């Protein structure tokens, strides 16, 4: 009695507290009443704008006295004492827990608890005689004024709430043996179903017998616990009573109560296994026969359980989450229905709710919220229109784990969620509010441009607009604002192709009038592509803004072609021109690679791709605009034969998202292994460094490393050039010394004529014609000068080909003769056929940059032609003066075969496939080549003689040719002298300059194979370019990579062939007695540091800590390879103990692998 009187006093105190209007003052924390965040509905109207902004950041919070875990909503009017009759609130909250069940009466805006009712403190015939018995409320379900509570002891309590807020215990149902997990009403408050942990679903008829169920359902004979069950209201139209349930076995079961016989059913009508593990929750869609299920497998499945899709076994949609799903619920209202104006309703503004015939549209019209299992403090809201990114996330500042939630119904049909956390707090969240800091919106923080990598080292980047994701264009065609923006975009597009500004204005006005857009001129200007760049976002402007539209110059109109969407016309159309576009079709796409560009085109790789077309239908008798980009069109007045009504296709200007996949050709494992194995790191016997570079160029070309191949060839030619020039300079120095020693005095004019004749190579190519006699010394000087000119021309060809836009075998419209390049690199011609040598060099020197500079001013046409051929003639050594051994001829044949097999874009090598076979000798290879189709021009004696006489009369000084303008520009005159240009090697195309540039670029690009090979080959030759630290760093990193890729033979080769001082350091770092074992599964180094730090267990390298797998057993004894034994890997991949393999191969004299793979091991 004392407790009852104390409770009455507290109720009177709270009643008086409410009467005198002090609800706005904060209540004491000791009081069990609610803590209200907003005083009343009237006082909230008097708040200022700043206070209103702060009030949105506060929410309704109620602190319960005991543990609560169940939540429900009672949707019936309750008369509160101080509210006027007929205006009572109709949405209230019900929370329950251990010996706790409260009804929280809320005000109309659900921002305040007006009254709380303890439903357990009622007198009834069903009340237990032991009031201190613990009974926990596990689930709550309400309908009208009835509250059903599923208890943890297996009973079901039914409460009735009167219009005056008085609760009574109406019935108690007890037939379950374990906890009741789910309750649902069937059409009325007289029939309910309940699912229990005992694996049964029971149907109760409160009118017949309140103590015994009328129907029992089980999924199978075994007791499969039921986590949730729900009645399907959509099956009533087919005269069925359908019940869905989910179980711990991961099954979704469908029962039809009207198809069973008797009062028990032990097998469902349909059963689907959608989850891999227990399913903890389900909820049926408010409009369609779809159900959402969530379980421990971190998935939310949306499944169509209708009769027409009963044979389907896979879900319609799957949402992958980061945790186990405890509860999943559909929203109560449409995503674009209700809410305050100006609030961020997420993507709801994009969806239309006018048509519910489409199931997909019905699914996206409702949001889906889920709660996670393992003490997670968040509630995540998804929408199937964008199921991979959460729409909103409720993440409380207190970070208290949420135990239950539900979608709350309200008068304004807003998106609100009620939650219960493990701090025993009831909290309300308004998802339509932009001022709640506990509600996160990932889409607002998501950048419009993103990129991602795949497993093949390729990446893709996406550019999209947030508000255009999967927008339904067909449903938007009925929207007046959408048509307005589309017409404005079409007007802006046609503006770029019209003849003048006046014409553009006329077309825009005509199209605007056809769309009835006179009242929306400002909207058209805002959405046009021709607006100021400042008014547009930077990311959008980067691929939609056309800078050419800013100029007022007259641009040509596009050529219109019939049948392809554009009509033929020869002149720019005027404003009143009439063009029939009744046969308009979208223009086909061009099959073009992303790397190919068109010069002068406005589009680029990052531009907007071709947009898809969509149909806009006009009413009969209404005129429509012209096709985008074409003046006039169907429905335009004045067009002969143009239809007034019908269908028109408009191209949308921007469609989102834009995906650009990019394939990167680097990090190719097979190419890396091939280059590491085939690259020559030392010069073979009988070859030179230039030959080694050419061989490496062929290796790089085979794997598609065309840039590296070209660099190797450039280095080879530059190296040969430098070697030849040094030899020529040495011979000239020797000749000068001999001349000074013998005191040979000749007239200055004779010396000048002699030097000019040697430099310009004016001597006739016919050995039978001798115009000027030379000594043997002079002939050697002529040969050296010829070599200088020939190699310089080769180098010019290399530079021009390397800097050109194309690296194909076609160079300036001419083919390259492979024999000319072979002869220019020191491979002699056998024979005295001067015409054949001249003809073979005609092609290889035709594109030389020195041709225009070699012809002397004032020469005749014949002299110019002769001068070109004479200067570009290669170094041709007669067979009588060339003395080669058999070994050198063998190397020549090998190099000849390499050159003939080289790539089409090789510099100076043959590319014809018909001559790619290995010839027995250079003579056989040359004989296999076809003769030149154009006959050679005969050499005339009078031209040659006149040229020589002219050179005799010149007064040139006997010195090297004057430097070109390119040499002066590329060379620093302050540090070098013009007389020794060919001696110091400081030109931009000198060997060391090219080597330095190639190393710097390759190192910046991470081409470790190239820089390491270069470092080994040219370390001794270019110590001033390749330092010791650079060489050691490159080779050390290269050896590390080779060992990581299990290329131990190649790694050892690099250490052995490294320079001496670098090799000593590498051998100390990578000693020969170091054994590194790699996992046979994940290919990672077996360090097993985790196991080494553990004190228990057996440590070894016969298992892997990274992938947690044991290594391969011995192929002979099938035991783990551990202990003090040696594991020997065979060619086939098997491994075994040293003793076992010794017994198999040595004692038993076997040659095949003991694993049965028949791979010969011992040969």
Curated annotation (Swiss-Prot):
It comes from the Eukaryota. A zinc finger (RING-type) spans 1114-1157. Pfam families: WD40, zf-RING_16. CDD domains: mRING-H2-C3H3C2_Mio-like. One of its GO terms (molecular function) is zinc ion binding. GO terms for biological process: positive regulation of macroautophagy; positive regulation of TORC1 signaling. InterPro entries: WD40/YVTN_repeat-like_dom_sf, WD40_repeat_CS, WD40_repeat_dom_sf, WD40_rpt, WDR24, WDR59_RTC1-like_RING_Znf, Znf_RING. It is found in: Vacuole. Its main location: other. PROSITE patterns: WD_REPEATS_1 (PS00678), WD_REPEATS_2 (PS50082), WD_REPEATS_REGION (PS50294), ZF_RING_2 (PS50089). WD repeats lie at residues 129-169, 175-214, 221-265, 274-313, 346-392. GO terms for cellular component: cytosol; GATOR2 complex; vacuolar membrane. Residues 28-41 have a biased composition (Low complexity). May be involved in a process influencing telomere capping. This is Restriction of telomere capping protein 1.
């Amino acid at each position: 009695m004392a407790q009852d009187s104390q409770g009455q006093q507290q109720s009177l105190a709270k009643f008086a507290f409410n009467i005198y209007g002090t609800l706005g003052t904060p209540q004491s924390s000791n009081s069990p009443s609610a803590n209200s965040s907003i005083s009343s509905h009237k006082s909230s109207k008097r708040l200022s704008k700043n206070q209103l902004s702060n009030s949105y950041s506060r929410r309704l919070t109620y602190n319960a006295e005991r543990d609560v875990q169940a939540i429900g909503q009672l949707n019936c009017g309750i008369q509160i004492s101080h509210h006027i009759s007929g205006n009572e609130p109709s949405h209230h909250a019900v929370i329950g827990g251990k010996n706790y069940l409260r009804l929280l009466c809320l005000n109309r805006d659900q921002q305040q608890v007006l009254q709380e009712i303890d439903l357990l403190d009622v007198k009834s015939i069903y009340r237990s005689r032991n009031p201190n018995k613990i009974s926990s409320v596990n689930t709550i379900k309400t309908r009208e004024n009835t509250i059903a509570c599923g208890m943890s002891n297996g009973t079901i309590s039914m409460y009735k709430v009167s219009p005056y807020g008085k609760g009574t215990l109406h019935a108690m149902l007890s037939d379950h043996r374990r906890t009741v997990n789910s309750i649902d009403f069937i059409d009325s408050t007289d029939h309910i179903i309940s699912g229990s942990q005992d694996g049964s679903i029971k149907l109760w008829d409160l009118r017949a017998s309140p103590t015994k169920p009328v129907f029992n359902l089980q999924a199978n004979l075994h007791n499969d616990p039921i986590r949730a069950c729900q009645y399907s209201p959509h099956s009533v139209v087919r005269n069925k009573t359908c019940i869905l349930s989910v179980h711990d076995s991961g099954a979704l079961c469908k029962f039809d109560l009207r198809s069973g016989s008797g009062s028990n059913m032990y097998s469902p009508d349909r059963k689907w296994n959608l989850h891999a593990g227990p399913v903890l929750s389900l909820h049926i869609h408010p409009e369609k026969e779809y159900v959402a299920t969530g379980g421990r497998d971190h998935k939310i499945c949306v499944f169509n359980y209708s009769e027409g899709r009963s044979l389907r076994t896979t879900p319609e949609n799957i949402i992958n989450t980061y945790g186990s799903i405890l509860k999943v619920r559909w929203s109560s209202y449409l995503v674009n229905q209700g809410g305050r104006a100006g609030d961020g309703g997420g993507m709801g503004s994009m969806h239309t709710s006018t048509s519910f015939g489409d199931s997909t549209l019905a699914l996206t019209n409702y949001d889906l919220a889920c709660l996670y299992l393992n003490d997670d403090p968040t509630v995540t809201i998804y929408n199937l229109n964008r199921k991979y990114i959460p729409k909103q996330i409720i993440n409380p500042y207190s970070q208290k784990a949420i135990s239950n939630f539900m979608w709350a119904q309200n008068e304004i049909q807003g998106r609100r969620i009620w939650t219960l956390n493990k701090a025993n707090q009831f909290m309300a969240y308004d998802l339509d509010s932009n001022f709640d800091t506990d509600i996160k919106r990932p889409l607002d923080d998501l950048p419009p441009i993103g990129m991602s990598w795949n497993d093949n080292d390729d990446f893709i980047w996406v550019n999209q607009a947030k508000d255009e994701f999967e927008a339904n264009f067909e449903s938007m065609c009925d929207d007046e604002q959408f048509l307005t923006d589309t017409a404005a975009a079409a007007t802006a597009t046609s503006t770029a192709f019209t003849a003048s500004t006046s014409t553009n204005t006329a077309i825009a006005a005509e199209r605007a009038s056809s769309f009835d857009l006179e009242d929306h001129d400002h909207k058209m200007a805002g959405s046009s592509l021709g607006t100021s760049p400042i008014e547009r976002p930077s990311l959008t402007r980067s691929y939609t803004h056309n800078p050419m539209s800013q100029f007022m110059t007259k641009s040509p109109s596009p050529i219109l072609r019939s049948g392809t969407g554009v009509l033929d016309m020869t002149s720019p159309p005027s404003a009143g021109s009439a063009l029939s576009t009744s046969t308009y079709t979208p223009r086909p796409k061009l099959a073009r690679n992303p790397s190919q560009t068109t010069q002068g085109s406005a589009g680029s790789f990052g531009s907007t791709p071709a947009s898809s077309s969509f149909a806009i239908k006009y009413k009969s008798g209404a005129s429509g605009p012209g096709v985008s980009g074409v003046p006039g069109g169907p429905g335009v007045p004045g067009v002969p034969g143009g239809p007034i009504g019908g269908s028109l296709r408009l191209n949308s200007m921007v469609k989102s998202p834009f995906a650009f996949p990019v394939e990167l050709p680097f990090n190719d494992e097979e190419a890396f292994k091939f280059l590491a194995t085939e690259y020559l790191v030392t010069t073979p016997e009988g070859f030179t460094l230039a030959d080694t570079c050419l061989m490496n160029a062929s290796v790089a070309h085979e794997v598609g490393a065309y840039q590296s191949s070209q660099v190797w060839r450039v280095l080879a030619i530059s190296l040969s050039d430098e070697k030849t020039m040094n030899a020529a300079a040495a011979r000239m120095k020797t000749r000068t010394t001999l001349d000074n020693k013998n005191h040979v005095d000749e007239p200055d004019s004779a010396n000048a004529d002699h030097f000019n004749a040697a430099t310009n190579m004016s001597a006739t190519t016919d050995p039978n014609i001798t115009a000027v006699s030379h000594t043997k010394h002079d002939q050697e000087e002529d040969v050296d000068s010829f070599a200088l000119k020939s190699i310089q021309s080769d180098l010019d060809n290399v530079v021009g080909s390397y800097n050109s836009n194309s690296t194909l075998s076609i160079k300036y419209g001419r083919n390259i003769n492979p024999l000319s390049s072979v002869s220019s690199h020191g491979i002699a011609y056998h024979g005295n056929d001067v015409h054949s040598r001249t003809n073979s060099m005609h092609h290889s020197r035709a594109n030389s940059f020195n041709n225009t500079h070699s012809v002397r001013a004032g020469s005749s046409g014949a002299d110019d032609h002769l001068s070109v051929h004479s200067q570009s003639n290669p170094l041709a050594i007669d067979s009588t003066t060339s003395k080669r051994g058999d070994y050198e001829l063998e190397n020549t044949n090998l190099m000849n075969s390499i050159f003939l097999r080289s790539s089409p874009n090789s510099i100076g090598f043959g590319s014809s496939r018909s001559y790619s076979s290995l010839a027995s000798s250079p003579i056989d290879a040359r004989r296999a080549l076809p003769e030149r189709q154009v006959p050679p021009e005969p050499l005339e004696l009078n031209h040659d003689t006149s040229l020589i006489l002219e050179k005799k009369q010149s007064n040139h000084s006997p010195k090297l040719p004057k430097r070109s303008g390119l040499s002066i520009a590329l060379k620093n005159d302050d540090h070098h002298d013009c007389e020794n240009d060919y001696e110091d090697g400081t030109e931009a195309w000198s060997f060391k300059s090219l080597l330095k540039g190639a190393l710097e670029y390759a190192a910046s690009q991470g081409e470790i194979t190239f820089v390491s090979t270069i470092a080994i080959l040219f370390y001794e030759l270019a110590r001033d370019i390749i330092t010791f630290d650079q060489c050691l760093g490159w080779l050390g990193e290269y050896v590390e990579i080779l060992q990581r890729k299990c290329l131990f033979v190649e790694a050892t080769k690099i250490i052995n062939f490294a320079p001496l001082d670098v090799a000593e350091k590498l051998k100390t770092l990578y000693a020969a007695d170091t054994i590194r074992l790699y996992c046979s599964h994940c290919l990672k180094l077996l360090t097993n540091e985790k196991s080494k730090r553990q004190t228990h267990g057996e440590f070894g390298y016969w298992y892997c800590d990274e992938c947690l797998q044991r290594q391969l057993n011995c192929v002979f004894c099938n035991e783990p390879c551990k202990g003090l034994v040696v594991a020997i890997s065979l060619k086939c991949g098997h491994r075994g103990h040293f003793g076992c393999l010794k017994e198999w191969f040595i004692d038993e004299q076997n040659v095949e692998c003991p694993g049965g793979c028949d791979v010969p091991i011992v040969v």
